[in-house]
Each structure stands twice: as C-alpha cells, then as structure tokens.
C-alpha cells in the first residue's frame, strides 16, 4: 500500500455553530493527484503505509474489532437525474441541459460566465455524486443538496424553513448543504478532471452553480451512484 495526504480537500462546517455531519467539502484540483486512479500514474513520491504499534490507534476504531457482517452489503446502482427543475441563469436552453443530464451530451460553458440550474432526481435519493470536466481552469463549481423547495417563513426557535408543496419552485427556494470544487483545468476528453465527494449525499434536488474564469469549461458528466441497504 502507498498513501498521500491530499491537502486540496478540506471538510467544512454545515452550520456556523454545531455541525452535525462535517462531511461536506471545499476542494480543488491538483496536478499532484490528477489521474491518480489511472494505471500509468506515477506514485513514486507517495509514502508506503506502515504498521502502527498497539495503543497508537483508539480501540474503538482498531481493526482488531472487525467481525463478520450480519447484514448485506450496501447496494450500488448507477443513476441519472430525471429532469431539469429550474433554469435560474444560463447561456444554454432547457433542452440543452436536459440532453446533458439524460444523454451525457457535453455542454460548453463560456469563459467569465455564471450558470445556475436546479435539477431533479425524481424522489429522495442517497448516492455518491460523480462529475466530469475538461478545461475550465479556475472555474468554481458548487453543488447544493436539498430535499424540498422551502418557503421564506420559518418556524420554531431554530427558525426551520416551512415546507408546503415540496416541488413548488415558483413559491419556494432550495436550502441545504453544499460541496465546492475549483478546477485545475487539466482534464481532457481522454482523461477528464473528475470530482467525487468522498461520502454519499442525500437529495431530491441539486442546485448546480458554476462560475467560470478566463478559460471556458466543458461539462462532460453529472450523475450519481445510488446506495443503501437492501430492504429485503
């Protein structure tokens, strides 16, 4: 085994005070790790994994506690987004975005441009997000995950947004936690730049916000791998 600390991923708070998850990311592409899953990647600078002495790792997370599974493995199923929910701001038509989501037809985002689109998974989902790009050096991508469109009014001491019709984009707006990624611009059609948050996300809607810099960006892919425990 070899290992390398990735200094280009930082886990960020979901809330300014108590942060219940601490799994959402502020990440950026890096020449050091670009293509690290490829067979020809040069890992000569990576450190070799070393055995650790007893007591260095807490017993609560020690491999010595491993036992045979009593439940099935979580399943994985490749899924695509079913629809475009709302086109907030874009240089492309709704049909262009639908072709990108359903057919994975590449979408060119011009330089110095902002895109805000909201997409629909069809139902509440749990899955691993996968994105793929070429070009776009310095472009900033954010993915906000939401279960519903919520109202401006809130309820209770914690000021929780009120939910009426969860799909009402006209009278509501999306609120949720997000991942942010800044592109290195190293991606090509043969070897795209890929961003996949480490842990799965739960969502019914996703708001995709793109801000390009001086380099145009090509969106190649946005889908997810559904996961969960089998119900039967």
Region roles according to the model:
Residues 1-232:
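Extracellular/oxidizing-compartment recognition motifs
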